[in-house]
A protein has these predicted regions:
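Internal intein/HINT superfamily modules and their associated LAGLIDADG
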Residues: 2-272
Length: 272
């Protein structure tokens, strides 16, 4: 009489082999059976063997499982500040990259991606280089054109303001000018700023959108502007208060959040 067959559930095999990316040899060690037994159970459960690219991944990656609001924030922040690519079309890894001198920016990136994959941070001469290694469920970040964010236009306000918060965390500024709170954001992304401007007007938040430098213009010590540079301003006290109260809950960048709260306090004091 032969040895009893070792039974291993499909759910457990999928967890160890696919989710945790363990090799059949490692799974065998973990479960107290041979490499061959694990290969046989994979075949019996119709779990396909991984191709070499997938098998080479040496750290676990989790599928994106966040809300539309979180996805919207990621897209806004990505468009504003991140480089996202795959090393090859067949790669199982989406690389999210950023170069910055701001520690707060690094903290935002880590808070977004650390729970989904490996985040590598290096510091050289005051410059941070951040690389995040995600799986293909983050392919929605690869493109930077309008198709990436147009779905947000028809979303609820919570989702829209998360996108705006992500974009502002990357690009925006809240300042005090002559004792008065102001907001501005400068960007080449004309279609995004035009949409944000119209959305805010629909919410009763008057703003000003204009081109501050035309493509080809030069300023001292800079190369010519490659495209028209746009600026969106909110200067009115009441409008800026509404904007800040809606936006502050979604900001993640410590400096941006501090600036926003300081601006709101400035407005409330001036109204007394």
């Amino acid at each position: 009489m032969g040895a009893p067959k070792i039974l291993i559930s499909k759910t457990l095999l999928q967890k160890l082999y696919i989710k945790e990316n363990l090799t059949p040899f490692k799974i065998g060690e973990k479960l107290g059976c041979s490499f061959k037994t694990i290969r046989n159970r994979l075949k019996e459960h119709n779990i396909p063997f991984k191709n070499p690219a997938y098998a080479r991944m040496t750290y676990s990656k989790k599928d994106f499982d966040g809300s539309l609001a979180e996805k919207s924030y990621m897209i806004g922040f990505r468009i504003g500040d991140l480089n996202v690519y795959k090393k090859s079309p067949n790669s199982y890894t989406v690389v999210v990259r950023c170069h910055t001198t701001q520690k707060q920016q690094v903290e935002v990136i880590k808070s977004i991606f650390d729970k989904f994959g490996r985040v590598s941070i290096s510091l050289n001469n005051g410059h941070f280089q951040v690389n995040c290694f995600m799986n293909n469920s983050f392919s929605f970040l690869l493109k930077k054109d309008d198709s990436t964010w147009k779905w947000i236009i028809n979303s609820d306000d919570n989702t829209v303001f998360n996108f705006i918060a992500g974009y502002i965390d990357a690009e925006g500024n809240f300042i005090l000018n002559q004792g008065r709170a102001r907001f501005k954001i400068d960007s080449y992304d004309a279609s995004i700023l035009k949409w944000i401007s119209e959305f805010l007007k629909q919410k009763g938040i008057h703003n000003k959108l204009r081109i501050i430098y035309k493509a080809g213009e030069k300023v001292p010590s800079q190369n010519p502007f490659p495209k028209d540079l746009w600026r969106l301003n909110i200067n009115g006290m009441n409008e800026l208060q509404i904007f800040l109260e809606k936006l502050i809950p979604f900001l993640r960048h410590k400096t941006r959040l501090s600036q926003a709260k300081e601006s709101l306090m400035n407005i409330l004091k001036r109204k007394k």
